[in-house]
């Protein structure tokens, strides 16, 4: 079963071509990596999938299919969370937006806290975002994305600005969550090393295009990453 299928997408903003002839597929249960440098078109591609394009955007496509239940986590956890509202209230609001009431919300949130490795005894729910570490903030965002029980999760640059140890922890959480919930994941990053031993398939976006394995930029990118991995070993 296909979770996402896009064929021949072209998108421009104010006459500037942003995405060109994009064809892209994700199967049920797959973890797909999308890598590209800043400005390559990754973020606008994410917004296209989620249906939150700017008014100035115009696009054409041959076909577009996506499952109805999508969760999304974005790059900056601190700006994604309301700094003036405690975590409990923010997650409760998300729960109500999905289910229309607060019935069983506490059991749901406590279960998700355990899933992402946050000890409920430490009272994370009664803290403000600034009282949490970067890794803890990202895990709260993961909980928010999972509340609605999506079968497709988009993670957009979620390991940016995190230290190496925290990056590894977050990646391991995504692996565990994928196995437990059987969801498909689109993991978007500019850091290829993040996707090592994680993604089932890796797409490379370059100047708004998905490039193939023979493209010079892709070859150079993968060769550089292999050299870095060797030096780390």
Outline where the language-model segments fall:
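The feature captures the beta-strand-to-loop junction immediately N-terminal to the Walker
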Residues: 35-37
